[in-house]
Amino acid sequence: VQQARQQASEVQSNQLSVRQELQADCLAGVWAYHNHQRTQFLEQGDVQEAMDAAHKIGDDYLQKRARGQVVPDSFTHGSSAQRVHWFNTGLQSGQIANCDTFNQNI
């Protein structure tokens, strides 16, 4: 990904970065799924707190708060909705194969 980003335009580089970050969100969900299966560590409300956190670190949420406007071409981590979706995808499936953000619509 890093090599592709170096050869891409700024917008394309940002899009690759978003895909990589969303994949990381999905993998975090996969980790939480499997850890919960082994240890039952998730308590009531934990998943909602994780979703709320994912929402609050979306590029659109952060840009709106900081600048008062949203510039999607400048996203490097994904929108709030994307981050919630991909974390939830990993959490619900527990399957790494479902985290292929490079070959799916994001």
Model feature map: region roles:
Residues 1-76, 84-85, 92-106:
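A Zn2+-metalloprotease active-site environment signal
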